[in-house]
UniProtKB/Swiss-Prot annotation:
Name of the coding gene: ndhB
One Pfam family here: Proton_antipo_M
Compartments in which it is found: Cellular thylakoid membrane
Annotated catalysed reactions: a plastoquinone + NADH + (n+1) H(+)(in) = a plastoquinol + NAD(+) + n H(+)(out); a plastoquinone + NADPH + (n+1) H(+)(in) = a plastoquinol + NADP(+) + n H(+)(out)
Lineage per the UniProt record: Bacteria, Bacillati, Cyanobacteriota, Cyanophyceae, Synechococcales
PANTHER family, per the entry: NADH DEHYDROGENASE
Protein name: NAD(P)H-quinone oxidoreductase subunit 2
């Protein structure tokens, strides 16, 4: 990248020697990522001391690193916008919001994973370090403003995700999931690289801002081809139809805590990438990529929720559910308005709690029974009221039942879509929401309505509920926390929407895109 070298030489000439490092790196913008990186290194060092030492010290190290990252992100909120790595990373409020969702999803995923790792014989040090590496890549991806930083962040997240998917070495399903994820992910990376090379050839720069300016006057077939390649990569990352084929198999075969992270953290990073690159670079192709996203959203909402009806595995059901949920979030992208983008950010925050709450219940049931079949949940309320209540509330929220947090998240998305005349998306969203309520309530009915004699054999042999075993207390904290936010968060939806709206209104990228879209509409 010759232009970056020229820029660096110019910076060296203008800056005093003591100012050069700050000008080149500006570490304050990436301090949250630095906290995660230090926690990852400390975890690896502690792991060298042995499994017993790691089991004792890895959890507090992870809590400290992620907690510090969240505090630093809170301090960056509404602070002056700073860039880092010669402008390749931007720490605006939009990036802060998505990075906070990812860091919190990792923290909750770790809380629900310790007992699972202990019971399955998984080395906690390596597992936590790889998960922190995936978190680091996802957080950097949220603020990446250069094709090089986008690709490096994307690959950091992807490679760590492949390792996590296949971490259960003795489980054939886990190895199969990792292989499928690796093959499809490698193809997606190659497609993105080809699209990036076309963008670089058209603009002569790797900066997303410079590419966006160049494409304003270069709406050629080659530019349209690069849009297709980039959009395919984004669709793969958010598991949108028809780029979803990897999702059910990977979700079913991977360790459940890994699935919990992939369903939220990886998806949030994918939507952050979509905002940065589609909205930032392809403003001249606004109508084209929105049309493609409309098709993807309709297909995702329809196929994801309809196919989920036939699933017998809880993890596969939530895999198809996550495909449908991605379709709902895409409504906000297609709108391209302040309300649409804000509803998108809000729904990702809501999805964090209701989905991870559901996975916490699934992990707890799996730890106690070793089963993932939906039919084995029959009559569960008799033996474990906490799992029954928690899973019921989280599933109702995912279905959009009032007054749960998920209901208000969907309402904001549908209102934004209707105001922007996206009637097809709103109607399809409403219909598929009803479909999703059916399979969510089917699980709840099975847990609650069954008579004692109709309980599954698994539930009849259900072990005594004990929270004193190692790793169970963090799991209970995560479960109760997620369920509480899911149940009570609907009351606080207005402050949450204001938080999401601030992330959008203070983003120069989104405000410029909204202004250009409005101008084209008036023209």
């Amino acid at each position: 990248m010759p232009e970056m070298g020229v820029f660096l030489l110019a910076a060296q000439a203008m800056a005093a020697p003591g100012e050069l490092l700050n000008l080149s790196l500006n570490a304050t913008a990436v301090l949250p990522e630095g906290a995660v990186l230090l926690a990852m290194i400390a975890t690896l060092l502690v792991d060298l001391a042995g499994e017993k030492v790691a089991a004792r010290w890895v959890p507090p190290i992870c809590y400290g690193g992620l907690g510090t990252a969240l505090v630093l992100l809170a301090l960056q909120w509404n602070a002056p916008v700073e860039s880092s790595f010669l402008g390749a990373f931007l720490a605006d409020n939009l990036a802060v919001a998505f990075r906070a969702v990812i860091a919190l999803s990792t923290l909750l995923s770790l809380l629900i994973s310790w007992r699972y790792a202990e019971q399955s014989g998984t080395p906690v040090g390596e597992f936590a370090a790889i998960l922190l590496a995936a978190t680091l890549g996802a957080m950097l991806l949220c603020g990446a403003t250069d094709l090089v930083s986008v690709f490096i962040s994307l690959e950091t997240l992807s490679v760590a995700s492949y390792l996590l998917s296949g971490y259960m070495k003795r489980d054939a399903r886990s190895s199969e999931a990792a292989l499928k994820y690796l093959l499809v992910g490698s193809a997606a990376a190659a497609v993105f690289l080809y699209g990036s090379s076309l963008l670089y050839g058209l603009s002569g720069s790797t900066s997303l801002e410079a590419i966006g300016v160049a494409l304003q006057t270069s709406t050629t077939p080659v530019a349209a081809l690069s849009l297709v390649f980039v959009l395919a990569t984004v669709a793969f990352k958010i598991a949108a139809v028809p780029f979803h084929q990897w999702t059910p198999d990977v979700y079913e075969g991977s360790p459940t805590p890994v699935v919990a992270f992939l369903s939220v953290g990886s998806k949030a990073a994918g939507f952050a990438l979509a905002l940065r690159i589609l909205v930032g670079c392809f403003g001249a192709f606004d109508g084209q990529w929105k049309l493609l996203f409309t098709v993807l959203a309709v297909l995702s909402m329809t196929l994801g929720n309809v196919v989920a009806l036939a699933q017998t595995s809880m993890k596969r059901m939530l895999a198809y559910s996550s495909i449908g949920q991605a379709g709902f979030v895409m409504i906000g992208m297609v709108c391209g308005t302040e309300d649409g983008f804000a509803a998108m950010v809000l729904y990702m925050a809501a999805y964090l709690f209701m989905n991870l709450g559901a996975f916490a219940c699934i992990i707890l049931f799996s730890i106690r029974t070793g089963s993932d079949r939906i039919s084995d949940y029959a009559g569960l309320y008799q033996k474990d009221p906490l799992i029954t209540l928690g899973l019921s509330l989280c599933l109702l929220s995912l279905g959009g039942i009032p007054p749960m947090l998920g209901f208000f998240g969907k309402i904001y998305l549908f209102f934004a879509g209707w105001a922007d005349h996206q009637y097809l998306l709103v109607v399809v969203g409403l219909i598929t929401s009803v479909v999703s309520i059916y399979y969510y309530i089917s699980v709840i009915k099975m847990m609650v309505v069954k008579e004692p004699q109709e309980a599954s054999d698994i539930v009849k042999a259900y072990p005594d509920v004990s929270w004193s075993v190692m790793g169970m207390q963090p799991l209970r904290v995560a479960l109760i926390g997620c369920v509480a936010v899911t149940a009570v968060g609907g009351i606080l939806s207005n402050p949450l929407f204001q938080w999401a709206n601030t992330a959008v209104t203070s983003s120069p990228l989104l405000q410029e895109a909204i202004a250009q879209s409005t101008q084209r509409g008036l023209g």
